[in-house]
Amino acid sequence: MGSKLYMVQGTSAYQTAVGFWLDIGRRYILAIVLSAFGLTCTVTIALTVSVIVEQSVLEECRNYNGGDRDWWSTTQEQPTTAPSATPAGNYGGLQTARTRKSESCLHVQISYGDMYSRSDTVLGGFDCMGLLVLCKSGPICQRDNQVDPTALCHCRVDLSSVDCCKVNKISTNSSTTSEPQKTNPAWPSQDNTDSDPNPQGITTSTATLLSTSLGLMLTSKTGTHKSGPPQALPGSNTNGKTTTDREPGPTNQPNSTTNGQHNKHTQRMTPPPSHDNTRTILQHTTPWEKTFSTYKPTHSPTNESDQSLPTTQNSINCEHFDPQGKEKICYRVGSYNSNITKQCRIDVPLCSTYSTVCMKTYYTEPFNCWRRIWRCLCDDGVGLVEWCCTS
């Protein structure tokens, strides 16, 4: 009998397994890979757009806060109080307004009480003008401002506090109170200080404080008559002498003022210097207005500058507040610009109904205010609130 051959066709177990996994891969693995790739691309695109937007905002904020376009700035929003409570004048070249929100940028630090007095740059630079403006626009000096716009407002600064007080028109002579209406409130530039016989006269009538308290007294007339004789403060006699005079003679000046702040300072008379022509203009008994109109800069700048500031160690000289030596805020301030539109803001829930004053300054402390930034102060009705803004 013959044999027959049979052919059996099929697949082995190995081929079956390979085919199974290839089928799984075609169905699921490809879908997973594509999903992961799409998700990664989406996240990357979203992050890129966010970074671009953030960099744009930061650049605008940096340009606004780091530029040298304006030295001073205030917030400009709709007033929340009556129009009569809004400051009507431009004090020292600064325009203030009561605001609903406070201007700031990015990193904000609130501080009560501490003026960071360890840095003479901050204390001398800002307090020279900004705090006086804050006093004038605050509730203390604005209470009777509409009735008596010529009243003087004083600002006293010490190590950790600022005191504002208002002197009524009755306590000052008529020529002193009427003088600010004839003068330009803008501060002269430091280019004009060469012809000024008293380059440091900005603090002449205000720099006699106790040697244990670091501070100065500013009035609404500081900076308007630098070339004239010292201005008569409340409590001075009729011959034109102020509480900072250094002439010898009987100390029969009144020792009390309207607010009783300077009764101790008028008794601390410094011995006269050896110059023969020291403040001869103050020895006349002519009225103040006549004396000022006939005053001629006959004294040398050296003699005048020696007499303008006391020799105490703790006195603040506002001229030298800038470590770079480029700006002297007591002599020159930047122009106010109300057309700034690009502003980075963070709402500071303080001082919602009181004025705010901001300026660019140099910080040495605290640690997050070490660079040139905006420094702002406002009055919350109890005391001064300070915050800083870094870009």
From Swiss-Prot:
Pfam families: Pneumo_att_G. It is found in: Host cell surface; Virion membrane. Residues 50-391 are virion surface. GO terms for biological process: symbiont entry into host cell; virion attachment to host cell. Residues 1-28 are intravirion. The keyword Glycoprotein applies. The keyword Protein transport does not apply. The chain crosses the membrane at residues 29-49. Residues 171-205, 219-316 are annotated as: Disordered. Residues 171-202, 250-261, 279-316 have a biased composition (Polar residues). It comes from the Viruses. Keywords: Glycoprotein, Host-virus interaction, Membrane, Transmembrane, Transmembrane helix, Viral attachment to host cell, Virion, Virus entry into host cell. Signal peptide: none annotated. InterPro entries: Pneumo_att_G (IPR008781). GO terms for cellular component: host cell surface; membrane; virion membrane. Glycans are attached at residues 173, 255, 303, 339. May carry a lot of separate O-linked carbohydrate chains distributed among serine and threonine residues. It is likely to be the virus attachment protein. This is Major surface glycoprotein G.
